[in-house]
């Protein structure tokens, strides 16, 4: 099975299955000299782990990370960083009815059709359990960016559950209030309504979808390459990799289809050097607005990158549904029991942030904004052929 690696210079390779012994991730391309310890990784994993509240799965995984390599005396060495997380509360017995009878709207049959076999416990490799690895990698990327000369900050919050939509909130409000409630919505009144809606679906044995607003600030202009390595193309790939993602938008997103060109086009103006929302020096040209979401021509403008990603309702629900045993051809009525989330966005917030951190850092390394060998080394201008020469360190 391929497709277990992403990133060009900051390369993340993951392994593990939902009900296997554990999960693991290897991060290659992290510069040497970054202060890093297990607590920094654990803080992010604790935001994603199951069993946080009544609106998450009750699976009791502590998600304790163990760093196996890549550190010396609390600093990265530039060698691969290996991290493992044990699975301690798997219950595979409830999945035995689906060994040859696929659960509706899961990857059970498609995996079996492709590979001729699969690990059926908990969905195996197709489970969202896999995202624990991504959050661990994202914590490493976050540490690199925080200790670099660039003030890159990424935040996200749940902005819609079902038909309940939060009003627009500021980046500062998201930073300060997105963790104030179990839904991870930065608007407290909306969060209460969202929580009640999730509870209602859960009590009825059903589930509900939603969306997450994300924003990255401090990203310098000029990152990305045309076409297939554009920033929106790579960010879109990273976010669509999250299980159950149905759409990803930047800037105006789908609303742009009903906006005239003159209205959406943004005039250019001159930076006065005091803007706190854009990376620009005094006298630099900057867009007068940001309906493009910090991206023009697939390349960063220095303005905030923002957008929205949506998820469908979780497919594991205790409702009677129809399936077919692919060995016997028998039609069956099945009920998916077990422990599952009634709505995905509350736990997906740290996953979204992690994928943005990983992808943005990769672009920063490719674009020569951060030395790929050592954090205290001189940046340089590299080609985007993924094999840059090391810069001179004087």
UniProtKB/Swiss-Prot annotation:
Residues 52-90 are annotated as: Disordered. Residues 66-79 have a biased composition (Polar residues). Pathway: Metabolic intermediate biosynthesis; chorismate biosynthesis; chorismate from D-erythrose 4-phosphate and phosphoenolpyruvate: step 7/7. Gene3D superfamilies: Chorismate synthase AroC. CDD domains: Chorismate_synthase. PANTHER family: CHORISMATE SYNTHASE. This reaction introduces a second double bond into the aromatic ring system. This is Chorismate synthase. It comes from Halobacterium salinarum (strain ATCC 700922 / JCM 11081 / NRC-1) (Halobacterium halobium).
């Amino acid at each position: 099975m391929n497709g277990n690696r992403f990133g060009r210079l900051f390369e993340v390779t993951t392994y593990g299955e939902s009900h296997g012994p554990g999960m693991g991730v290897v991060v290659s391309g992290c510069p040497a000299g970054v202060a890093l310890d297990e607590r920094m990784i654990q803080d992010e994993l604790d935001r994603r782990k199951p069993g946080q509240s009544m609106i998450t799965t009750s699976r009791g995984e502590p998600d304790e990370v163990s760093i196996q390599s890549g550190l010396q005396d609390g600093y990265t060495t530039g060698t691969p960083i290996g991290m493992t997380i044990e699975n301690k509360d798997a219950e595979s017995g409830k999945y035995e009815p689906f060994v040859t009878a696929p659960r509706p709207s899961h990857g059970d049959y498609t995996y079996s059709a492709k590979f001729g076999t699969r690990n059926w416990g908990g969905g195996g490799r197709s489970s969202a359990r896999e995202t624990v690895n991504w959050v661990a990698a994202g914590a490493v990327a976050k540490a690199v960016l925080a200790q670099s000369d660039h003030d890159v900050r990424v935040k996200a919050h749940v902005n819609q559950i079902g038909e309940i939509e939060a009003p627009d909130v500021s980046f500062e409000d998201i930073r300060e209030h997105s963790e104030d409630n179990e839904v991870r919505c930065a608007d407290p009144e909306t969060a209460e309504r969202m929580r009640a809606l999730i509870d209602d679906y859960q009590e009825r044995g059903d589930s509900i979808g939603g969306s997450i607003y994300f924003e990255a600030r401090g990203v310098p202009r000029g990152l990305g390459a045309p076409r297939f390595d554009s920033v929106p193309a790579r960010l879109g790939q990273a976010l669509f990799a999250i299980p159950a993602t149905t759409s990803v938008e930047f800037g105006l997103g789908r609303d742009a289809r009903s906006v005239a060109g003159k209205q959406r086009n943004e005039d250019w103006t001159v930076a006065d050097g005091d803007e706190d929302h854009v990376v620009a020096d005094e006298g630099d040209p900057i867009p007068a607005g940001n309906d493009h979401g910090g991206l023009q021509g697939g390349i960063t403008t220095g303005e905030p990158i923002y957008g929205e990603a949506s998820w469908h309702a979780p497919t594991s629900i205790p409702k009677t549904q129809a399936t077919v045993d692919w060995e016997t051809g028998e039609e069956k009525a099945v009920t998916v029991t077990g422990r599952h989330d009634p709505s995905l966005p509350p736990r997906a917030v740290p996953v979204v942030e992690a994928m943005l951190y990983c992808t943005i850092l990769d672009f920063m390394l490719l674009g020569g904004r951060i030395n790929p060998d050592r954090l205290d080394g001189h940046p340089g201008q590299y080609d985007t052929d993924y094999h840059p020469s090391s810069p001179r360190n004087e």
